[in-house]
Amino acid sequence: QMPNIYSEVKGELKMANIIIYGGGFQAAAAASKAASQAGNAQIYVIIPYPVSDTSKAFGSIGTLGGQNFFDVRHWNGSFPYRGSFEWWYSQGGSFYNTETMAARLTTDVTKYSNVQVFYGYDIFSFSTAASPYRITQVTIKKIARNSSTGFVEWSTGTYTLSGTVFVDASDDGRLTRLVNFGGTVGRYDWPSNKLDSDERGSSGKPRQQVASLMFQVKNIQ
């Protein structure tokens, strides 16, 4: 249970060039790509879900949560995934083993010496600067699941991470929401012929990517 008012608990100060918030496939893709393309950069990855010593892995819902993300088919004869996701698909197929995929994602990120991962930490406070408005630091604190209540609670262990580039690659966009970032969550590079008229041009409305939900249906005969 996260408090609404943040105290000034700082902990050890650590410096990085790129700080990535999230632990899912998208975070693993951002971290591995940044590490491979910016070899001189120090990269920190904050995984904001509680983990045990035996479950320190990337993938979030798509691995530790037991949900298969690649249960797809070839629409119109064209495979939908590219880039890092295409590589991971080639390693596991449509019906991958979630434990195996978790190990694959984690290996593909942690094989780079310029990446440090903070497993089971979440944002406790943050600092910004003006002109232009930007994030400068995040203070992260260890989290753990209360075995009695099931709630995620603050634990012990705090770091303050200072960086130049911050990437919100989380499942819920918590970093973006906390700092009140005024950007778009859509895909700016979509072809204009796929957009509504009011979404076109530099002053067009923000373009929201398609989101899908999964439901569990019971008692169907």
PLM feature segments, named:
Residues 13-26:
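Beta1/beta-strand and adjacent pyrophosphate-binding region of the FAD-binding site
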Residues 31, 35-36:
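Gly/Ala-rich phosphate-binding loop of Rossmann-like dinucleotide-binding domains
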Residues 26-27, 101, 105, 171-175:
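Stable alpha-helical elements in mature extracytoplasmic
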